């Protein structure tokens, strides 16, 4: 049996029942992967022809709604088929690790957000925009996005308290300076594409600011000269945080433009009012040739996906990280 791989037009023989990711790795085919368990979605690829048995949906991959897409680590090859490895020039491979860490600072930028600064016992490699699972106790673990970069002295995480949320309430009540945690990852596909040279749209809603900060800082630090348009949206003034940090970043880097958007209530000078989707539609005539990084609550991310597609961005160039509340 044979597997045809695009876009490099390579043919690889395999035996029925073989795992797709193992076949690719054994034959030196570059593909992004991380957790090897179907959780992170990093090894997603498209089936062009033939059939592949994919158990990813059973592992909670609800975002893989298009039946053409499968997770290579969860896929079994049953017959001749052809696949496409997406963005073959933007492959990232950060083998998943479990690392111990210590909380060195707990900050309260708003009434319902805690900013944790964590010092890890070992280096932790990830791509800007990815996330990791933080385990605070055997019964309290949840994924959170890194707000910084791999070479930062401390990892930064933004955690919003969800009423009735088992993990977030534990964090607010029990996590203090000196608390020991475990970090596992990295996970996620909404990471910075460093070879893209066109404009970037980065949108963060609430604590979705964390991965957006990582992406923007990563682009600036790596020397990317792309124009970057950053929108940070919150519900009201009391939910706004890090605005000065964002505007200082923009002042230091002319290629970066920052807009803070307040959905309800009064606004201050320089702020925008209304829904973030409406503001973006007013500001941008076309997103053709752009890359979009969208992070925040599922409803906001889904609305942004619709708007950005309507403005002309290719769907494969939308990188979305929706903060689903499961297991909170």
Swiss-Prot record:
Enzyme class of the recorded protein, top EC level: oxidoreductase
Subunit structure of this chain's protein: The naphthalene dioxygenase (NDO) multicomponent enzyme system is composed of an electron transfer component and a dioxygenase component (iron sulfur protein (ISP)). The electron transfer component is composed of a ferredoxin reductase (NdoR) and a ferredoxin (NdoA), and the dioxygenase component is formed of a heterohexamer (trimer of heterodimers) of three large alpha subunits (NdoB) and three small beta subunits (NdoC).
Pathway where it operates: Aromatic compound metabolism; naphthalene degradation
Species, as recorded: Pseudomonas putida (Arthrobacter siderocapsulatus)
Swiss-Prot/TrEMBL keywords: 2Fe-2S, Aromatic hydrocarbons catabolism, FAD, Flavoprotein, Iron, Iron-sulfur, Metal-binding, NAD, NADP, Oxidoreductase, Plasmid
Cofactor(s) in the UniProt record: [2Fe-2S] cluster; FAD
InterPro entries from the UniProt entry: 2Fe-2S_ferredoxin-like_sf (IPR036010), 2Fe-2S_ferredoxin-type (IPR001041), 2Fe2S_fd_BS (IPR006058), Beta-grasp_dom_sf (IPR012675), Cbr1-like_FAD-bd_dom (IPR008333), FAD-bd_FR_type (IPR017927), Flavoprot_Pyr_Nucl_cyt_Rdtase (IPR001709), FNR_nucleotide-bd (IPR039261)
UniProt protein name: Naphthalene 1,2-dioxygenase system ferredoxin--NAD(P)(+), reductase component
Residues that hold [2Fe-2S] cluster according to the record: 35, 40, 43, 73
Cofactor note: Binds 1 [2Fe-2S] cluster.
Gene name of the record: ndoR
High-level lineage: Bacteria, Pseudomonadati, Pseudomonadota, Gammaproteobacteria, Pseudomonadales
Result after altering residue 65 to V: In strain: G7
Pfam families: FAD_binding_6 (PF00970), Fer2 (PF00111), NAD_binding_1 (PF00175)
Catalyzed reactions: 2 reduced [2Fe-2S]-[ferredoxin] + NAD(+) + H(+) = 2 oxidized [2Fe-2S]-[ferredoxin] + NADH; 2 reduced [2Fe-2S]-[ferredoxin] + NADP(+) + H(+) = 2 oxidized [2Fe-2S]-[ferredoxin] + NADPH
């Amino acid at each position: 049996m044979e597997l045809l791989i695009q876009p490099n037009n390579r043919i690889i023989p395999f035996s029925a029942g073989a795992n797709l990711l193992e076949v690719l790795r054994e034959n030196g085919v570059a593909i992004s992967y991380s957790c090897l368990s179907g959780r992170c979605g990093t090894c997603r690829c498209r089936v062009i022809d033939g059939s592949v048995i994919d158990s990813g949906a059973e592992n909670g991959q609800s975002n893989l709604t298009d039946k053409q897409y499968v997770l290579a680590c969860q896929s079994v090859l049953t017959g001749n088929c052809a696949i496409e490895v997406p963005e073959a020039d933007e492959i990232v491979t950060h083998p998943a690790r479990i690392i111990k860490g210590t909380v060195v600072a707990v900050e309260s930028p708003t009434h319902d957000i805690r900013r944790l600064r964590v010092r890890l016992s070992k280096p932790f490699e990830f791509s800007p925009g990815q996330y990791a699972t933080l385990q605070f106790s055997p019964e309290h673990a949840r994924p959170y996005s890194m707000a910084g970069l791999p070479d930062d002295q401390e990892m930064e995480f933004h955690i919003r308290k969800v009423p009735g949320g088992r993990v977030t309430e534990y964090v607010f009540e029990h996590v203090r300076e000196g608390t020991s945690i475990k970090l596992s990852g990295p996970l996620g596909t909404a990471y910075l594409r460093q070879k893209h040279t066109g404009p970037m749209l980065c949108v963060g809603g609430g604590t979705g600011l964390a991965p957006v900060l990582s992406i923007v800082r990563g682009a600036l630090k790596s020397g990317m000269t792309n124009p970057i348009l950053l929108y940070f949206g919150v519900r009201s003034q009391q939910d706004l945080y890090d605005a000065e940090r964002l505007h200082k970043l923009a002042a230091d880097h002319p290629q970066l433009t920052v807009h803070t958007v307040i959905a309800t209530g009064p606004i201050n000078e320089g702020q925008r009012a209304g829904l973030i989707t409406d503001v973006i539609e007013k500001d941008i005539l076309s997103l053709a040739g752009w890359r979009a990084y969208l992070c925040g609550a599922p409803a906001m991310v889904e609305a942004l996906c619709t708007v950005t597609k309507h403005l002309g961005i290719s769907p494969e160039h939308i990188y979305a990280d929706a903060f689903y509340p499961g297991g909170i």
